[in-house]
């Protein structure tokens, strides 16, 4: 951040405009956070009630929730502050060259990306190790105590996602109310350019870029990052439970390798992103969008490849060579080599990259989907909108096929732990992804500062090149976030099923099927409320802008000064008022369904929200992004039916109308879907102990584990081992037969198990088994070694 602040901030007028944008954004955030303090207080009381009702939910979850909410708000605030520092400096850099403008705008994005990812890793790591110190005492089974620790950590994720939802929805309503109002009256009715200082809504529009596309996005990706890592850690605990069935699990990481792995991958991803940021540069002052995009892609791919290489070594180092996992629907434990976990992680990285490519195809300048919308603009706004809707709907096909392949492939390789690791690997380069995403709004703001400061035309041309690339990277980033949300939600869903102790979700039950449909409806209603909120706020903005054009003399001539503050106030009040209902629906609905209908119907509801939410997110994000770049195509000029069309033409006005429809799609309701999906599953996970069999004498859940541990001291255990060792390869395979007697004259319960892996791993597990046995018989490569008892 210090480097960004050292750059020249421009002349006095540029600094004044930048200051107005910063003050407006800060004023909104202060008002928003003041309102959210009330929500955090009420939610903390509710979590306190849950901790009193359920033994396995500790009161510390309240503190974790508050810290998560604070960190999420801080992530958005940090992003907004750096963006408002970088906007005028980017415009000033654009006076000299395009490479300098990219360097400053991407530098601002880098600070935000590294700050958000660093906060996520720091918060998760600190709280996790504090909770491990508090709860892992050895008084109960490791799984039981770790479950309590991770349930407390879920409070951190719940706090982060809750604030992210309100920040995303509130910021989206703010920015699009201003944007739609500015476009409809300024561009379409008055015929003045975007960001023209004569437009009363132009400051509000630029403030909106920061509170929505920067602060909202920062909180959003912070929440996504935390939820993804948490889901993988929870499922890592289940892996340890499965592997402890035959013998106590031991490793060099305090018996926590599968749990710590996603956290370590996240940390390595931050380091890989730092290296990637150094590769983002261009040399030519005549570079166009393609060269800028290539520079960003180079840095992104470098971060992805470095993360993939590091993941291979981390997985080999932190996981046993083989693991036993219980798959749903399979009676016996499945032996999973650690390399399968690596393959699952690579599926996550590959699918994340492929979905980014699919999103880029449907939303980029010069690609067929965008050109189709451009051609349809020649016959008016109606055909433009029809074409945009079709593009958004068609874009779901390839994205969903890729999601499905990722889920099926990663689950087949390593169960739900594989799915969670796929999501973790995908999100590991969040710092780089966020740096790329954030540079777009900074460049957009820089263009606004240049226009309002009446700088030379070449400055705006350079910022427009960056802004155009930023529109595509923003759409790609949203597609990336949806992909991770889908995989994370599935992992959280698996954790929910295990936490509650239910066998699965049976849709042949009437209540489950009914709630499945209710869940499918929620994203539709949520989107409708968000769109309606933007429409209502935009109407207020349009009326105010028209009033000022009519009543303030000299605005169009440039001699009168618009009342910018009134437009800023309209957006602020509308956003704060309208964000409450969608947020409360998201949080309260799963609680009511869970308490009234029970665990399985709530599972049906969660499944409905996930499937429907993913479809609506892809459709809205891609349709909005395509409409936006269809409008921008006219700035350079496009050929329609043999005739060149430019800004100001009837076709361009139709494209502006389409973009105005798409704005709330891509910046308000669309991006909120991935938070809606994850937050629904997180709420279910937090209330799962109330709905499930925690503390009951059942065959599933935490109580079973505790009961078995306590019972094990009352039985007589005899163990027979037949081990084959390959000394050259350093691997071993042991067939273990365990005889458990309730008393010396009773009939034994016989259990058979195969332990395979490196020689050190197998011997460590056999030693743990030996310590728990009354009689231990070992045969190694066909010869008896010892018999103790």
Where are these regions (language model features)?
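Hydrophobic packing and interface segments
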Residues: 1-704
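Short linear regulatory motifs and low-complexity interaction segments
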Residues: 699-789
């Amino acid at each position: 951040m210090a480097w960004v602040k050292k750059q020249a901030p421009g002349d006095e007028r540029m600094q004044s405009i930048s200051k107005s944008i910063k003050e407006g954004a800060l004023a909104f955030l202060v008002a928003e956070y003041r309102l959210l303090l009330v929500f955090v207080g009420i939610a903390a009381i509710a979590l306190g009630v849950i901790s009193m009702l359920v033994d396995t939910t500790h009161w510390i979850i309240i503190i974790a929730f508050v810290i998560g909410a604070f960190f999420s708000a801080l992530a958005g605030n940090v992003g907004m502050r750096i963006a408002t520092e970088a906007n005028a400096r980017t415009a000033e850099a654009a006076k000299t060259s395009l490479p300098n403008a990219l360097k400053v705008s991407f530098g601002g994005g880098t600070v935000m990306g590294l700050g958000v990812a660093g906060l996520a890793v720091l918060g998760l790591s600190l709280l996790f190790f504090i909770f491990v110190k508090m709860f892992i005492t050895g008084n109960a089974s490791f799984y039981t105590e770790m479950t309590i620790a991770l349930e407390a950590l879920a409070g951190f994720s719940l706090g982060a996602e809750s604030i992210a939802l309100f920040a995303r929805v509130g910021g989206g309503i703010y920015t699009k109310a201003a944007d739609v109002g500015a476009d409809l009256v300024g561009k379409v009715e008055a015929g003045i350019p975007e960001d023209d200082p004569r437009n009363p809504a132009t400051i509000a529009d630029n403030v909106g870029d920061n509170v929505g596309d920067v602060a909202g996005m920062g909180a959003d990706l912070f929440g996504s990052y935390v939820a993804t890592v948490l889901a993988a850690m929870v499922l890592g605990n289940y892996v340890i439970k499965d592997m402890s069935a035959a013998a106590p699990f031991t490793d060099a990481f305090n018996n926590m390798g599968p749990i710590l792995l996603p956290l370590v991958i996240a940390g390595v991803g931050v380091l890989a992103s730092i290296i990637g940021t150094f590769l983002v540069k261009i040399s030519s002052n005549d570079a166009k969008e393609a060269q800028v995009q290539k520079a960003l892609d180079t840095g992104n791919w470098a971060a992805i490849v470095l993360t993939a290489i590091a993941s291979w070594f981390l997985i080999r180092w932190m996981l046993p060579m083989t693991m036993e996992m219980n798959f749903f629907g399979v009676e016996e434990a499945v032996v999973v080599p650690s390399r399968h976990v690596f393959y699952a992680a690579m599926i996550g990285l590959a699918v994340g990259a492929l979905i980014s490519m699919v999103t880029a195809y449907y939303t980029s300048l010069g690609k067929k989907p965008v050109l189709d919308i451009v051609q349809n603009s020649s016959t008016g706004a109606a055909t433009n909108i029809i074409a945009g809707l079709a593009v958004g709907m068609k874009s779901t096909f390839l994205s969903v096929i890729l999601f499905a392949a990722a889920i099926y492939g990663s689950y087949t390789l390593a169960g739900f732990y594989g799915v969670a690791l796929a999501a973790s690997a995908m999100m590991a380069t969040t710092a780089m992804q966020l740096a790329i995403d954030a540079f777009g709004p900074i460049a957009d703001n820089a263009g606004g500062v240049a226009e309002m400061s009446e700088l030379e035309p070449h400055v705006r041309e350079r910022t427009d090149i960056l802004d155009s690339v930023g529109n595509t990277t923003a759409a790609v980033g949203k597609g990336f976030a949806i992909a991770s949300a889908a995989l994370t939600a599935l992992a959280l869903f698996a954790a929910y099923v295990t936490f509650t102790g239910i066998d699965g979700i049976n849709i042949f039950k009437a209540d489950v099927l009914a709630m499945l449909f209710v869940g499918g409806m929620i994203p539709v209603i949520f989107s409708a409320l968000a769109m309606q909120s933007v429409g209502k706020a935009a109407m207020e903005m349009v009326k105010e802008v028209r009033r000022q054009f009519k009543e303030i003399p000299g605005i169009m001539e440039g001699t009168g000064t618009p009342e910018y503050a009134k437009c800023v106030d309209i957006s602020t009040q509308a956003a704060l008022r309208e964000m409450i209902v969608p947020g409360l629906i998201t949080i309260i609905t799963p609680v009511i369904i869970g308490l009234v209908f029970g665990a399985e119907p709530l599972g049906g509801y969660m499944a409905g929200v996930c499937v429907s939410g993913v479809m609506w997110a892809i459709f809205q994000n891609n349709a909005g992004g395509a409409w936006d770049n269809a409008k921008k195509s006219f700035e350079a000029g496009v050929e329609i039916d043999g005739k060149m069309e430019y800004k100001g033409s009837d076709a361009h006005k139709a494209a502006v109308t389409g973009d105005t429809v798409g704005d709330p799609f891509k910046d308000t309701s669309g991006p909120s879907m991935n938070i809606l999906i994850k937050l629904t599953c997180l709420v279910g996970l937090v209330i799962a102990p109330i709905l499930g069999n925690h503390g009951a004498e059942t065959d599933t859940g935490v109580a079973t584990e505790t009961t078995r541990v306590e019972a094990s001291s009352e039985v007589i255990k005899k163990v027979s081992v037949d081990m084959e060792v390959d000394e050259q390869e350093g691997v071993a395979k042991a067939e273990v037969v365990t005889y458990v007697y309730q008393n010396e004259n009773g009939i034994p319960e016989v259990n058979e198990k195969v332990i395979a892996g490196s020689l050190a791993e197998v011997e460590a597990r056999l030693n743990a088994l030996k310590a728990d046995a009354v009689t231990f018989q070992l045969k190694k490569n066909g010869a008896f070694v010892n018999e103790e008892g």
